[in-house]
Each structure stands twice: as C-alpha cells, then as structure tokens.
C-alpha cells in the first residue's frame, strides 16, 4: 500500500510551475530536438494534460536565426485558431534560466508518421479523413491575409489524437507570412520541398506539394525519395521533375491520381480548397455500400485486404467553400437573427490616451462590457480589434465591424484622427460553433498569459473581479477588462433591478491606465535589451512594476525589426 502511495506522490510532483501557477511540468520528456525539449505537463484549471515546450536561449548565442524561428512559431500559434491547427495556451520568458517556455495541447498518439507505423492496416476511409483535416488546416493558413505558408509540412509535423481520429498541423517554426507575391528563402525538408522552392521563388502551393508527399508517406510507410542516399540526389530528381519511386508502387489508380494532382507543376497544381472538392475526398456511394478490395501499395505485403467503406457526410465545409476565391477566413459569424446589439463609448484621458467601453448584449439578456485603453499615437482600430478577438476569444462578432466602431468613436473624440479601417484586411465568413462568447465560470477562462519569471513571486495580467454578490463574472486579459452580466430588469412594482454591479470596487479606470503604462514600459524594456546586447549566458535582471509582463510577440517584433524602425 505504501508503495502505491509513494508512486502516486512521485508522479504528481511538478519539477517546474509556470508564473501563473496554472501549469505544472513533469520530468517526463515527450520529445527532444536540437534546441527544443517537450515535456508532459498538467493544466490544473482544466484538469488536462498539456505539452510544455522549453527552448534554452543559450543554444542560440551563435545562431540567432534559430531563436527567431522559435519566436515566430510562438507568435503564429498565438494568433491562429482552427480545429486542425495545434492549440496554443500560454508563453513566457524565464530570465533566470534563460529559456523560452510555451504550452500547447498534448497529442495522445504522437505524430501521424508514428501513428501510421504503429497501425499499418488502415482503411482508405481513414486516410481520406486525415487528408481532409490536413487540407482544412492548410486552407485556414493559406486563406489568412496575407497567407501563411507552413514550409515544412510532413507527417512528422502533423499530430493526431488516435482515440478521436483528430489530426492537427503543428511545428510552425519555419512558417512564413507571404507579404509579397512569393517567398524568397529555401527552407524545409528536402524530401517534401517542391521544385520551385529550390529556385527561392514560391507561394503557398508548396504546402500542397508537401501534402501530396504526406499522402504518399501515409500509404507507403516511408519517406518519399527513400531510394536516395544524399540530399543532392533528391535535389537532382526533384528539379528534373522525377517523382519518387514509391509513387509508382501505389497500385490504386484513385490514390495515384490524387497524389499526382498535388505534385503537378506549380502552374497546374490545385489549391487546398480545390483538393477538398476533389472527387477522391468525397463520400463513397451510400446506397451501394461499395466494399471492393483495395491494394494501394505494392511495396508492403502485410497490409492484407483494404476495404472501401462509405464515408459519413461532413457538412462542415459545404457552405464555407462555395466561393473559389477566399482572401481570409472570417473569425466570426453574426447573423441578423442573433439579435445582438453592440455599442461603444469612450472618453479622452490625455493628449493621446482614450478609454473605451465596448458593450455587447443579446436577446437573452446577457451583457458583455469590455473596457480597454487606446493610445492614438501607437494603436490602430484594426490592431486593437484583432487583439481583442485573440485575447478574449470572441466568437460571435465581426472583427471588421468592431474596428469600424472603434474608428468612429475615436474620430468623434479626436477630430484629426485618420480612419484606418478602409485599408485594413477584409475578412470572409467562417461559421463557428461557439455560441455565446460569454464565459460560464471565471476560473475556466482560457486566457493567455505572458509573464516574466524572475525567481520571485510572479505577477500576471489576470485579475478576478468580486462577483460573489451578483450574477456576473469578470477578468482582465492584457489591456482588456472583460465583464459579463445580465441586463437590468424590473420588479412587479416597477422598481429597477440590476443583476450585477455597474463597476467592481476592485477595478477602476486608474488601474486600466496603469495597465497601459505597464504595456508601454515592457515594450521599451525589450527595445533597450535588444539595443544594448544580444542574449548571453548571464541572466538579465528586469525590474518591472508588479503586474508587468514581457510579451513574446513584442520581443519577437523587436528582434525582427531594426531598432531604429520602432518609435520609442
């Protein structure tokens, strides 16, 4: 009995805890690369296991490009929200241990390559489902504005939860935002790199080529071009248009035709959207229950008989992909029938400072008040609206509409304010199954924290409001104070009753103004660090006002841009 208790106690001991106290890291290593180590960790708030990614900064003293790669991965993961893209939870810089830490979701079955090698007898129906999910993730990346190219798509970078058949794209360290018509850097894994990558002039279709190689890997259990012994041999074959030998071992004509469409010349190559509409990925005949044997790979003689089963109809993308031209996936759906009222009100606090309140109410009487500062010297309506959507996980409003409302209110308060929403990105409609955008319990909010661990008691930007006396809940996410409640009602005698206080005694406008100053201070601190010296072996002491946190995206921006280009 004592042995069992000792085992439980040992397994529950955290070797490290994040600054917020929410995530605890175990000593168990899930994976290890040249610079990054992934540990098993636990989310105490949600009661789920997560992946704790740790990158030692001392590994980059001679290779700052690799450091920027990891900052890029963290920055991109934070801004992405899709069911087929790896979820990002939080990140922080540990200045004492000189490490970057970020927490992502944990995949129970590892990578798709590992999973496929463990389960060799897989029906074509399952392969199709995996393909559809990967393409949906790619479509989301490519439909961003500007598009995002993964640049290193392979089964090693695709993860799966085997108990649900859920597939997600991860490892975005080499991903690039396509700000021009093409990218100009040769990166990736040679076996999965399209011919145009070697010419260093390419677009998002290189991911489609890599996806085709992934399909080939799924059905052949091996890397493409495994017959080559050196990257130079792969380069010669790829640039001369020769397909890998494994392609010719695929006997199923439909599989071969589908892969060939992915590997076609860039001028003829289909997009992720077009591949999703390809007949190969559509459901089989439900009436006939066609179950003919399939022998899709001739190079492995233990696969046995594969049966083609009818697929279940997946209506998720029927409405979303009616148009063949998509600039960016819309973040929210807001139909007229939702009866959602939105209003915004603000007041000036100084020359450049403005304090705003965005109020969202619905037909069921729920009210959401979002308080936030706006500094006209550095903020734009679009950037603040996007930040609000990302931080607060708003799912039922249009980011463009919010940006326009912010612009209009700022213009009313500042006569010489220049409206910026006309040049902002247009957003298309992406139906979202999340219904409310109102939290059920404050304790379970999926907020993102970015803090600096300094060895002392950590402070973070998540403040709980006192909601014990009313039916409301509130929290602070970065610059935003988020308050939920119910609309005022009237009793039988006509007396007005309110389900919540107008403002909590623990939160005031002064605190929001201090929060704005902290945000500005931490930005300047990062610029001073990057101007003064590069990251080195000696820990850097950072003295901040309690409640301050260093934002990884800000640090990433400071690294990526010339210091002189940033206005102090």
From Swiss-Prot:
CDD domains, per database record: STKc_WNK
Record: residues binding ATP: 104-107, 154
Presence of the UniProt keyword Cytoplasm in the record: no
Enzyme class: transferase
E.C. no: 2.7.11.1
Entry's Gene Ontology BP terms: photoperiodism, flowering; protein phosphorylation
Active site, UniProt feature: 171
InterPro entries to which the protein is assigned, alphabetical: Kinase-like_dom_sf, Prot_kinase_dom, Ser/Thr_kinase_AS, WNK_Ser-Thr_kinase
Domain Protein kinase: 24-281
Biased composition (Basic and acidic residues): 463-472
Induction: Expressed with a circadian rhythm showing a peak before dawn.
Pfam families: Pkinase (PF00069)
PTM comment: Autophosphorylated.
Gene3D superfamilies reported in the protein's UniProt record: Phosphatidylinositol 3-kinase Catalytic Subunit, Chain A, domain 1, Phosphorylase Kinase, domain 1, Transferase(Phosphotransferase) domain 1
Catalytic reaction equation(s): L-seryl-[protein] + ATP = O-phospho-L-seryl-[protein] + ADP + H(+); L-threonyl-[protein] + ATP = O-phospho-L-threonyl-[protein] + ADP + H(+)
Effects seen without this gene: Plants display early flowering and altered expression of genes involved in the photoperiod flowering pathway, such as ELF4, TOC1, CO and FT.
One GO MF term attached to the UniProt entry: protein serine kinase activity
Keyword field: ATP-binding, Kinase, Nucleotide-binding, Serine/threonine-protein kinase, Transferase
Disordered: annotated span: 453-473
Transmembrane segments: none
Function: Regulates flowering time by modulating the photoperiod pathway. Possesses kinase activity in vitro.
Family membership: Belongs to the protein kinase superfamily. Ser/Thr protein kinase family. WNK subfamily.
Name of the protein in its database record: Serine/threonine-protein kinase WNK2
